[in-house]
Curated annotation (Swiss-Prot):
<keyword id="KW-0221">Differentiation</keyword>
<keyword id="KW-0524">Neurogenesis</keyword>
<keyword id="KW-0539">Nucleus</keyword>
<feature type="region of interest" description="Disordered">
    <location>
        <begin position="95"/>
        <end position="181"/>
    </location>
</feature>
<dbReference type="GO" id="GO:0030154">
    <property type="term" value="P:cell differentiation"/>
</dbReference>
<keyword id="KW-0217">Developmental protein</keyword>
<dbReference type="InterPro" id="IPR017970">
    <property type="entry name" value="Homeobox_CS"/>
</dbReference>
<comment type="similarity">
    <text>Belongs to the HMX homeobox family.</text>
</comment>
<dbReference type="Pfam" id="PF00046">
    <property type="entry name" value="Homeodomain"/>
</dbReference>
<dbReference type="GO" id="GO:0007399">
    <property type="term" value="P:nervous system development"/>
</dbReference>
<feature type="compositionally biased region" description="Basic and acidic residues">
    <location>
        <begin position="153"/>
        <end position="174"/>
    </location>
</feature>
<feature type="DNA-binding region" description="Homeobox">
    <location>
        <begin position="178"/>
        <end position="237"/>
    </location>
</feature>
<dbReference type="InterPro" id="IPR009057">
    <property type="entry name" value="Homeodomain-like_sf"/>
</dbReference>
<dbReference type="GO" id="GO:0000977">
    <property type="term" value="F:RNA polymerase II transcription regulatory region sequence-specific DNA binding"/>
</dbReference>
<dbReference type="GO" id="GO:0006357">
    <property type="term" value="P:regulation of transcription by RNA polymerase II"/>
</dbReference>
<keyword id="KW-0804">Transcription</keyword>
<dbReference type="InterPro" id="IPR001356">
    <property type="entry name" value="HD"/>
</dbReference>
Length: 306
């Protein structure tokens, strides 16, 4: 009996974690518990160093199970409040999800970096800058922008305008001549002027004034008409003289050439006429033969009459 009391008083031996029973039976708490994140503080440090990661494209770091007894993190790291990048609180017991997440504006300062998703949304800290920039862009119309971009071209145009003015002001430029108006005379005026010109080639000042008054013309018009008419008259005289000289020279060059050849019909007539022509008598005729005293040619007369 005392032995049985001693056996009942002794506490049962603790089961070792490496026993068959403990290995076969898996702990539900350990299986359901998510692994601890070792690199979460490193990720926060990277975010603080201006490495902005989008919530949808964050890099996933491997999470390793490390014994907490040997490699235990300090308490201020384990008990820190969750940030906008990770909505879980670190504690000694593991990860416990929190439903209440603090506002980003409380955690993010004015100089904290913003992720790619936050860049798309308007910055609530600097609303004045955006409003001022929008007002400046609206105040500048498209015409003003075009004018600002085309300043060098306007400078070139101004230079070309100044060069054009200099050319106008230069003394070497010849003044443009005004086109003279041509006076149109009536038939009666032309007839009177022609008849006066046939009588007298040159007019005195008094005669020119009287003729201009009778024809209702100015003295200058009458004077110019007489000048042009005299020039025309001189050209006509020169042309007539040249034509007369040419005709006289052509008459002097004419030479009479005798006809040396006739047609067959006229050849017989020419032959008969030639036969009828009398033969001219010789200049020296002797009625009697002349004899020489030479013994060889004594019997040969020198000339015989025909």
């Amino acid at each position: 009996m005392p032995e049985t009391g001693q056996e009942s008083s002794n506490p049962p031996a603790k089961e070792s974690p490496f026993s068959i029973k403990s290995l076969l039976t898996c702990e539900p708490s350990r299986a359901a518990r998510p692994p601890k994140a070792l690199f979460t503080p490193i990720k926060g440090a990277l975010d603080g160093a201006a490495f902005a990661f989008s919530p949808l494209t964050d890099f996933t770091f491997p999470r390793l199970e490390i014994p907490t007894q040997r490699f235990a993190l300090p308490a201020h790291y384990l008990e820190r409040s969750p940030g906008w990048w990770y909505s879980y609180t670190l504690a000694h017991g593991g990860h416990t999800p929190r439903t209440e997440v603090p506002d980003k504006s409380l955690l993010l300062g004015p100089t904290s970096p913003v992720s790619g998703g936050e860049r798309d949304s308007p910055d609530p800290i600097h609303p004045l800058k955006t409003e001022l920039g929008a007002k400046e862009s609206e105040s500048k119309s498209p015409e003003e922008i075009i004018l600002e971009e085309s300043d060098p071209e306007e400078g070139k145009k101004d230079d070309s305008g100044e060069d054009w003015k200099k050319r106008e002001d230069s003394p070497d430029k010849k003044p443009c001549r005004k086109k003279k108006t041509r006076t149109v005379f009536s038939r009666s005026q032309v007839f009177q002027l022609e008849s006066t010109f046939d009588m007298k080639r040159y007019l005195s000042s008094s005669e020119r004034a009287g003729l201009a008054a009778s024809l209702h013309l100015t003295e200058t018009q009458v004077k110019i008409w007489f000048q042009n008419r005299r020039n025309k008259w001189k050209r006509q005289l020169a042309a007539e003289l040249e034509a007369a000289n040419l005709s006289h020279a052509a008459a002097q060059r004419i030479v009479r050439v005798p006809i040396l050849y006739h047609e067959n019909s006229s050849s017989a007539e020419s032959a008969s006429s030639a036969a009828n022509v009398p033969v001219s008598q010789p200049l020296l005729t002797f009625p009697h033969p002349v004899y020489y005293s030479h013994p060889v040619v004594t019997s040969v007369p020198l000339l015989r009459p025909v």
